[in-house]
Every structure is written in structure tokens, then in C-alpha cells.
Amino acid sequence: MTLIYGHRGAKGEAPENTLASFEQCLKHGVRRCELDLHLSKDGELMVIHDPTLKRTTERRGKVIEHIAADLVTYDARKGGPGWMHPCPIPRLEELFEKCDFEHWQLEVKSASRTRAATTVLAIREMAVRHGVMDKVTVTSSSREVLKAALELTPDLSRGLVAEYAWLDPIKVAQGYGCQMLALNWTLCTPERLEKAQRQGLHVSVWTVNEPALMRRLADFGVDSLITDFPGLATATLGNG
């Protein structure tokens, strides 16, 4: 059975990477999610996709230039589906406290060696504190992040985010001891899927929003798909 992950919560239905979006995902019975993390100026894990604030909050500057106490007051509704109420940028901790997901894909964007190390250690500390070590996979396309995760937090599950095939994504994933391969759906051929699964990788494809494509990838046998529309996915595939 192909599992469903809500992309940034339910990005097509509610403001991405906000509490409202993750609650919307859970309303559909989808208890797996993908989200993006950046560090605040004071080292807290903030749930936001871009390194800058402009696209979702219309504020200036980078996430890393603002302290968490300020970031959680910024309304992140801009550019998404219409939403009546303000949707502030959440801390990861708030989501761990308020959302009962069975599994979390925590994507860490590219980072310097120092920031990568700080980020993966912070994730591990929070996952331990909230008892979700077995429910978390740290994913990234950044070699620095995956290297830091392998060396500093080897007991955290890891996943390679692969958008291009110019380097063999299966080989790269294996090189960092990954358990998951988060694959751009355009790269998901039956041959690559079979090879990855044969080598023990959970293959999670993104971002899949068309019902016909959902069915085709499920027929291929992908382990999971990541979608902006978890409600549509459950209606199409009949599972959460």
C-alpha cells in the first residue's frame, strides 16, 4: 500500500508549513507529513521553506536574522490558499506538541558545515525529548546536512532528497547510510524504484497532485507519495 504524506502539511489547502496546514492534513486522516526547517537567530528550529521571509510573510530578511520569539508573530499566509485567520510561523516544538503524526519527514535545506551540525543535533535533542526518534526522518539534498547527520546523529533516520539524476541518487543515498529516498516523481521509473527498494530504501515521491499520476505511481509500487492535497490523495487511493 502506498502511504500518503502531506507536503508542508496540506500546502494546496491551507497556508504551507503552518499549524493550520498540518491540522488540515490530519483532518483527512493523513498522519504523515513533510516539512522544512531553518534555524532562527537564537538557534530554534523554525518551520518554513525558504531561507528568506518575503514569499510567505512579506517581511524582509532571512530567517537566521530573526529570533524565534519574533518569527512566531509573523503571519505566513501570503501566497497560499485563502485563509481567514493569521497563521504564524511555527516552531517545530509546537507541532510536536500539537500534532499526532505517525511519521515526519523533516527536510533541512542546504547549510554550512557548522549550521548543518547545529541543526541535526537540535533535531535529535527535540526528537528525544518528545519521544519521536522512531517517527522522524531527517531529509536533505545537501551533502553537508547528510554528512553531519551520519556522523553526529547516526541513530536518526536519514533520507536523500533527489531532484536530478546527474548523480545516481541510489548510490548517493547509500553513501550516507540513508533509509529513505525522497525522489522527484519525474525520476521515478519502475527500474529505479525496483533497484532502490531492492537495496532497502523507502522510496517517497514528490510532489504528486494529479489523481491519474497518484494512481500510476501507486501501481508502480512506490512506498509513499508526498502531495499538496492530502484530501484528494486519500479519495484517490483510498488510504491515509
Label every model-predicted segment.
Residues 1-49, 54-59, 80, 115-120, ...:
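Conserved N-terminal beta1-alpha1 strand-loop-helix module at the mouth
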Residues 4-6, 33-35, 104-106, 136-138, ...:
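Hydrophobic faces of well-ordered beta-strands that scaffold small-molecule active sites
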Residues 49-160, 179, 199:
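Metal-dependent phosphodiesterase/phospholipase catalytic core, i.e.
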